[in-house]
Amino acid sequence: MSTFLTDEGIAPAVLGPALEERGLDALFVAEHTHIPASRETPYPGGGELPRVYYRSLDPFVALAAAAAVTRTLLLGTGIALVVQRDPIVTAKEVATLDLVSGGRAVFGVGAGWNREEMRNHGTDPRTRGRLMDERVRAVVELWTREQAEFHGEFVDFDPVYCWPKPVQRPHPPIYVGGGGDHAFARVAAYGAAWMPTGVPPKRLGEQIDRLRQTTGTDTPVVVYGAPRDRESLDLYAALGVERVLLHLPTRPEDATLQRLDEYAGLVAAYR
């Protein structure tokens, strides 16, 4: 599942077990720290910005709540806005989630779209791609070295100790969001998978070919916010997509559980 967890929807500690009980094996949650009251950047989905963007929970706190009451559920960010995050703090948060969940964390990353939100974090939108790449590489250094250091254009720190280290080795998988050549280059550099958002199957095949030409490997593809009709799911399967994350609307508990029952029936044929 991919969703926005908010103060108005189902609680993560209820949602996690409900997913496991229905044979749904992953929970990926979105991140926005805030929404500026004055915004010029258009919403990529068109129209007004949905209410859930204004009210989203901190992803790592929410995923930790789900981790505490589940045993097998994958717990991922979809996506963590790395360009708005301190890499040392982020390394500790992801590693802690991986530890408390017994090795179930997935670090989904992206460069974001809301320029005003970025600026409030001191990020220049024009250089956010290079900033993201450095911060992800710095996080990996912090995860994998007893004494980590990093010296780049945007990230610079002398040798430090940063614990805990992740349970997964060498580190939690990094799923790279976004599309196009820049995203494919990031997958080649540090990604375990490419995570496009809602790309229809008829367009995805050509993009997968370009991705794998860039990476030189049979790179896994995880579709975030996938359409929930059986025809699309069949086409994704035929393309070799490893996983689809169906979009779960943000609703109160009863309505969410009813929707999960519908999803469980839909995905049963693909297990």
Language model: regions and residue ranges:
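Active-site-adjacent structural elements that line small-molecule/cofactor binding pockets in enzymes
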Residues: 1-271
